[in-house]
Design a protein with these regions (language model features):
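Predominantly extracellular beta-rich ligand-binding scaffolds that present long acidic/polar faces
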Residues: 1-285
Length: 285
């Protein structure tokens, strides 16, 4: 049990490393991490709980060459495989080149629930970074995965591709269920930008009760890329149910996105099942 009232970490601590770097654990295999945080939501998915003391408030990879080159960097765990993380809140400053997340950098067949992130700095200045997520940089599931009760307070204002408020990239070889996830931060990047997920790949991904309150900005964009309040782009079919976007979506001039939408920006193949969803914000494209 990770209790921030007992486990007190110096906020000035600095962690430096190349791959699989985490504020608490670098690589976690077949393990469980449990804290004391529980996010509370209103009936309309507004966060009503107070921001608690974080498990890790330090600094990860703020110096060269780590900030430009590191992969699988997480505020709690860098790389997690066949593991479970729950009830964790962190507030790091974090940098990396790819698969960077506020809780986990790269999550393989891992379940995550009741977690929150409010970073001081999130990858600021690394505009070539890919797969950046407020909670998880990239999630890859070859067996059934569930993610629930997740909240991101952090702005992510730089990045190249697969940038999302909760997940940068979601790859599903089997069924994935995402339930009650909320983004409050501004998400601004170049390609495949989403309030909840940057881009999905896989035919059995279901999103329920998601809400985005942050501004979503597409900076440049290219064909086969999208910008969306919930998901930027989907490589295959996706189901989005009872979800809402409250954040304005803005696209810079001369951008070449295939699409921008209040819920979903672009679907490449297989179609999308969008039911009982609502966009309550402006789209400037």
């Amino acid at each position: 049990l990770l209790n921030p009232e007992i486990l007190v970490i110096n906020p000035n601590i600095k962690i430096k490393g190349g791959n699989n770097v985490g504020g608490i654990i670098g690589t976690l295999y077949n393990g469980t991490l449990t804290g004391t945080y529980t996010p509370e939501f209103s009936a309309t998915n507004v966060i009503v709980s107070k921001i608690p003391r974080p498990i890790f408030p330090g600094n990860i990879n703020s110096e060269k060459p780590y900030r430009e080159n590191a992969t699988s960097v997480g505020g709690i765990v860098g790389y997690a495989d066949k593991s479970t993380l729950r009830r964790l809140f962190t507030q790091p400053s974090i940098y990396g080149r790819s698969t960077v997340g506020g809780i986990i950098g790269y999550a393989s067949d891992t379940q995550v629930s009741d977690c929150g992130v409010k970073t001081e700095t999130f990858n600021n200045g690394n505009n070539s970074a890919i797969m950046i997520g407020g909670i998880i940089g990239q999630a890859s599931c070859s067996s059934h995965c569930e993610f629930s009760n997740l909240v991101n307070y952090s702005d992510i204002t730089s990045g190249s591709n697969y940038i999302g408020g909760i997940f940068g990239s979601m790859v599903a070889g089997t069924s994935v269920k995402i339930n009650k996830v909320v983004n409050l931060g501004k998400i601004s990047a170049t390609n495949n930008v989403g309030g909840i997920i940057g881009k999905t790949s896989g035919k059995d991904i279901e999103v329920y009760d998601a809400a985005n309150f942050g501004v979503i900005q597409g900076i440049a964009g290219d064909k086969e890329c999208g910008v969306g309040g919930i998901a930027g782009a989907a490589e295959d079919a996706i189901t989005i149910y009872k979800s809402v976007n409250h954040g304005n979506i803005t696209i810079n001039r001369n951008a070449k996105y295939y699409g921008a939408g209040g819920i979903l920006g672009y679907v490449k193949q297989g179609g999308a099942h969008v039911r009982y969803c609502c966009n309550r914000a402006n789209i400037d494209y």
